[in-house]
Design a protein with these regions (language model features):
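Long, contiguous binding/interaction regions
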Residues: 1-90
Length: 90
């Protein structure tokens, strides 16, 4: 089998506390927004966003690696959920 050329993929990773976990940062932001007059804000949940560039042969391989990174390091599966989007960079 011939070697495939590596492509660059951009993984956009979103990590957020699970809905059942208290979010003190989100509560603080919510209070700040309300005190600034943004009375229509009902709630805020804070999270993390990361962009990771990967050299992989296929989108499936990039997806597997991103999942592995999230599960092993980036997200704490006990209290956080994650999702990601992949795009091939030209």
């Amino acid at each position: 089998m011939a070697n495939q050329e590596q492509a660059i993929f951009l993984a956009k990773v979103f990590i957020q506390l699970k809905p059942t976990v208290s979010d003190p940062q989100g509560q603080t932001i919510h209070g700040g927004l309300r005190s600034l007059g943004f009375e229509s804000v009902r709630s805020v949940r804070a999270g993390k966003y990361m962009e990771i560039s990967l050299d992989e042969e296929t989108e499936a391989a990039a997806s597997r690696k991103t999942t592995e990174m999230c599960e092993k390091l980036l997200a704490n599966s006990v209290i956080e959920d994650y999702r990601f989007e992949l795009e091939k960079v030209e």
